[in-house]
């Protein structure tokens, strides 16, 4: 089980925005991470969550942009030579498209410009001709039993988040 706590910088911790600090809570693969978010992302999580048993749980409306940002950030850091687990990058990518299958057909909230840019950049990284779609499709088939059309799923994300069409 993994628990992630989201916060804004309190000014007392010297971390880069978006930096993740894992904290192992048990020897049996449980972990706890505290993630410092940019204000726009923090506000998104606060506004778009589901309360279950008194706990606010981020929903697809906030998780998709967060996962897209994590993919962009970790891909950038990997390209700059940083040691990044490629499985985590692939998981963020697949999570975006898996969560997109749960979005309603009606448009969602208007995102702040910073987040709109990030989600658009993420979608532009997966044109329908991308060789990654084979792996994405296999991942979705294994986890949710669904096959996806790249054009349809990227268009659904763009429509829900009110983004310009991507190709």
Predicted ranges, named:
Residues 1-167:
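Compositionally biased terminal segments of proteins
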């Amino acid at each position: 089980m993994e628990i992630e706590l989201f916060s804004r910088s309190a000014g007392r911790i010297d971390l880069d925005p978006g930096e993740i600090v894992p904290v192992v809570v048990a020897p049996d693969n449980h972990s706890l991470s505290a993630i410092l978010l940019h204000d726009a992302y923090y506000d998104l999580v606060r506004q778009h969550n589901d309360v279950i048993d008194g706990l606010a749980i981020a929903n697809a409306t906030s998780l998709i942009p967060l996962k897209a940002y994590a993919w962009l950030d970790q891909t950038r850091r990997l390209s700059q030579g940083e040691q990044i687990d490629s499985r985590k990058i692939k998981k963020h990518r697949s999570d975006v498209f898996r969560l997109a299958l749960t979005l309603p057909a009606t448009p969602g909230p208007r995102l702040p410009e910073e987040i709109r840019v990030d989600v658009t950049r993420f979608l532009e990284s997966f044109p329908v001709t991308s060789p990654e779609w084979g792996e994405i499709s296999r991942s979705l088939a294994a986890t949710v039993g669904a096959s996806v059309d790249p054009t349809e799923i990227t268009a659904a994300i763009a429509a829900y988040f009110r983004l310009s069409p991507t190709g």
